[in-house]
Amino acid sequence: MADGYWNRQQSLLPHSGLHKRPRPDYEMPASGLPSGNEMHYLSREEDRSGHPMVKDSKTIGSAYDRYLQGQVPSFTSGEASTVGALGLQRGIGGLPNHSLSDPSAMIGRHGGGGPDLAPNGRGMNYGFQPPMDPVSRHGPEPALLPPDASPTLYIEGLPSDCTRREVAHIFRPFVGYREVRLVSKEAKHRGDPLILCFVDFANPACAATALSALQGYKVDEINPESSHLRLQFSRYPGPRSGGGPRSSGPPRGGHGSRGRR
């Protein structure tokens, strides 16, 4: 009977291999992917925490750093600030193995070539027009002055009662204007005195501008019989030491300066 009792007790004892109850709900399937229930469970956990669950983030970060180091060379602090201010980041334009010192890599972004780019990236002109040499600009050439041009104009056609202030009011707006000189001479025959007028400018170019603008100018627009101005370059420009005009303008009478001696 004793043998039968012990055989019966051994049959009632659990097998040594069955110490842990199998839990198929928490075991990973053979494919290595979580089941449908586990996927829903993981998504709910991520929604609660707000951060996705990423495995081995250190390995991913190191691989990304190696990728960046292999695509674009490193910059110095000064170069990085210059490139960063222009909105250019690493991996510019999706062009691998192209440095910023290669002009061909920048032609497509700015259209057309510019000045040579320095190897260190300094002095690069992104989208700015380089300064032009004033000599190389093609503009209208200034009008050629006649050979008898001078900085003094001789004026004819002024009324006999005009004043120096009135004449100066006509010529003062022109650039380079300096002064007006009026000389009144008695007429050979009875009549109004002859007014000699000289206007001095800074240079012949300024005098030529006034001559071109005022040639044929009508002094009095209300009076229909008003004379028109006639301007020409003076042959002997500049005031005389005595304050009067030089012997310029139209030829004088036959007695001239000899008759005064």
Swiss-Prot record:
GO terms assigned for molecular function: mRNA binding
Subcellular location: Nucleus speckle; Cytoplasmic granule
Name assigned to this protein: RNA-binding protein 1
Protein's gene: RBP1
Keywords, in A-Z order: Nucleus, RNA-binding
Alphabetical list of SMART domains matching this protein: RRM (SM00360)
GO CC terms, sorted: nuclear speck
Nucleus keyword on record: yes
InterPro entries, alphabetized: Nucleotide-bd_a/b_plait_sf (IPR012677), RBD_domain_sf (IPR035979), RRM_dom (IPR000504)
Biased composition, class Gly residues, residue ranges: 240-254
Main location class: nucleus
Keyword match Chaperone: no
Known tissue expression: Ubiquitous.
Domain RRM, chain residue ranges per copy: 151-236
Role noted for this protein: RNA-binding protein interacting with the enod40 RNA.
Region (Disordered): 1-38, 232-261
Pfam family, one: RRM_1
Record organism: Medicago truncatula (Barrel medic)
